[in-house]
A protein has these predicted regions:
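PLP-dependent amino-acid enzyme catalytic core
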Residues: 1-185
């Protein structure tokens, strides 16, 4: 599926190009050309990794579907304790979607654990071998989730910035103690 820039709808790129580039040349965001129609009934009963694979396959059409299945299965498996996308019964017919079962207990783990795999595959799809630097500015959970997702990913370096006194002490320590040869805080 083509993606276009929010600042130039005439410039279309593949999903691999959008993921590898991050922002468009004009400084815009890449958005999908359309939103696929999905058969919701066909998705019912799927576990979270299979559901995620079914959805991302609709958007990342230049990726190998088998890769996407493997990537979502490995991402949302053990690191999420088997509870990715877990619906907890509150009472009666009321449920709560628990988004804290990822490795950093932040909802951002859902994106930031899968994205590094998608970036590495995008670079492979495009034949790109240069290093990629991910820059993150945060005042909270994003920093730790990004550091955890991208740590020790080949060909990628990540640097996280946060304002002095702008995070809780726990968040600062989570970021400052992140292991990985390619991380900087």
């Amino acid at each position: 599926m083509p993606f276009f820039s929010t600042r130039d709808q005439n410039r279309k790129v593949t999903s691999s190009q959008a993921i590898a580039q991050g922002l468009s040349d004009e400084g815009g965001l890449f958005v999908p050309e359309s939103f696929p129609q999905v058969d919701v009934k066909a998705l019912c009963g799927l576990d979270y990794p299979a559901l995620a694979a079914a959805v991302v396959r609709e958007y990342l059409t230049d990726y190998d579907p088998a890769f996407l299945t493997d990537a979502t299965r490995s991402t949302y498996g053990a690191a999420f304790g088997g509870k990715a996308g877990y619906l907890a019964l509150v009472e009666g017919d009321t449920y709560a979607l628990e988004l804290w079962h990822g490795p950093t207990c932040a909802f951002k783990d859902y994106a930031l654990q899968l994205m590094p795999k998608l970036l590495v595959e995008a670079k492979k799809n495009l034949g790109r071998t240069e290093k990629t630097l991910i820059l993150v500015a945060t005042s909270g959970d994003t920093g730790k989730a990004a550091l955890d997702g991208y740590h020790d990913i080949p060909g990628v370096e990540i640097a996280v910035f946060y304002p002095t006194g702008g995070t809780s002490e726990i968040q600062r320590l989570q970021m400052a103690t992140q292991e990985g040869a390619n991380v900087a805080v």
